[in-house]
Curated annotation (Swiss-Prot):
Monomer. This is in contrast with most of its orthologs, that are non-covalently linked homodimers. One of its GO terms (cellular component) is extracellular region. GO terms for molecular function: L-phenylalaine oxidase activity; toxin activity. This is L-amino-acid oxidase L2. It is found in: Secreted. Catalyzes an oxidative deamination of predominantly hydrophobic and aromatic L-amino acids, thus producing hydrogen peroxide that may contribute to the diverse toxic effects of this enzyme. Is active on L-Ile, L-Leu, L-Met, L-Phe, L-Trp, and L-Tyr. Exhibits diverse biological activities, such as hemorrhage, hemolysis, edema, apoptosis of vascular endothelial cells or tumor cell lines, antibacterial and antiparasitic activities, as well as regulation of platelet aggregation. Its effect on platelets is controversial, since it either induces aggregation or inhibits agonist-induced aggregation. N-glycosylated. It comes from the Eukaryota. Its EC number is 1.4.3.2. Its cofactor is FAD. Expressed by the venom gland. Its main location: secreted.
Length: 20
């Protein structure tokens, strides 16, 4: 993702805010 925005589309590839 571009920014650490959990409100945006979650990309479970290289993000931490993504749980599943």
């Amino acid at each position: 993702a571009d920014d650490k925005n959990p409100l945006e589309e979650c990309f479970c590839e290289d993000d931490d805010y993504c749980e599943g």
